[in-house]
Amino acid sequence: MNFLVSILLGIIQGISEWLPISSKTQELIASHYLLGLDVSIAYTFGLFMEMGSIGSALIYFRQDVKRVFHDKFLLKFLVVVTALTGIVGVPLYVISDKLLQNAYNPSIPMIFLGIALIADGIYIRYSRSRTREFKNLSTKEMILIGIAQGIAALPGVSRSGMTVSTMLVLGINPEDAFHYSYLAYIPAAIGSVGTTLLFTRHHISYVVSLIGIDGIALAVISALLTGLVVIGFLLKIAKTKKVYLIDFMLGGIAVLVSMLGLIIS
């Protein structure tokens, strides 16, 4: 039974990480109900599960990873964005862990995220065409993207939703926005996993005691394989220039699911 739960948790991570619906919150909710985890432990586990998604990104974007140290602009982008993500995100993670111990409800920010996605979809649909390329980003714009990614440490706030939306608002074309948002995820996620091990490794130890090392490994592998499929699918959609349809759909889902969560709680 635990194996089936591990696979399901991995699939949830593998799908939700690359969609603007906050994977850590989906994992939080799923592990809370499937494993009976305390909300704060479930939040930590959701961040820890990014190990599988890191694997997906490293495999899918392996050519980009190889050229990082040969492409000064790409290296600068990753350094600036990752640094700001850490500066903003680590304190928010520590604060969030405390809030979740006091019955913080992640459905609340999910509602705001859903509304923001719908508004972003409207903005994208009716605003000027996004034709700027990634290489045209300024340092100030990289800082904004890093701050946006750092804010996503909060429960209910989507990392990909924050970074992709920020780049789209800056006029970056959808294909580049998705591509480099996913690439920026790699160092940020490594930092997230490291942060959980540094500050809340006792939470991870507790989950291991429930489903075992083999259960954790199965969940991570499931997340990795699922993520590879989802990344490819979303990048194909980004090429069609109809990203606003994703925003409308996921924004509506986020609002409905969050309202249901509030009613149930």
Swiss-Prot record:
GO CC aspect terms: plasma membrane
EC number(s) given by UniProt: 3.6.1.27
Group of enzyme by EC: hydrolase
Residues annotated as signal peptide: none
Membrane topology: Multi-pass membrane protein
Subcellular location: Cell membrane
Keyword list, A-Z: Cell membrane, Hydrolase, Membrane, Transmembrane, Transmembrane helix
GO terms for MF: undecaprenyl-diphosphatase activity
Cytoplasm among keywords: no
Keyword Transmembrane helix: yes
Coiled coil: none
Pfam short name (any one): BacA
Bilayer-crossing regions: 41-61, 75-95, 104-124, 137-157, 180-200, 215-235, 244-264
Catalytic activities: di-trans,octa-cis-undecaprenyl diphosphate + H2O = di-trans,octa-cis-undecaprenyl phosphate + phosphate + H(+)
PANTHER family to which the protein is assigned, alphabetical: UNDECAPRENYL-DIPHOSPHATASE
Function (record text): Catalyzes the dephosphorylation of undecaprenyl diphosphate (UPP).
NCBIfam families tied to this protein: PRK00281.3-5
Protein family membership: Belongs to the UppP family.
Protein name: Undecaprenyl-diphosphatase
Organism: Saccharolobus islandicus (strain Y.N.15.51 / Yellowstone #2)
Taxonomic lineage: Archaea, Thermoproteota, Thermoprotei, Sulfolobales, Sulfolobaceae
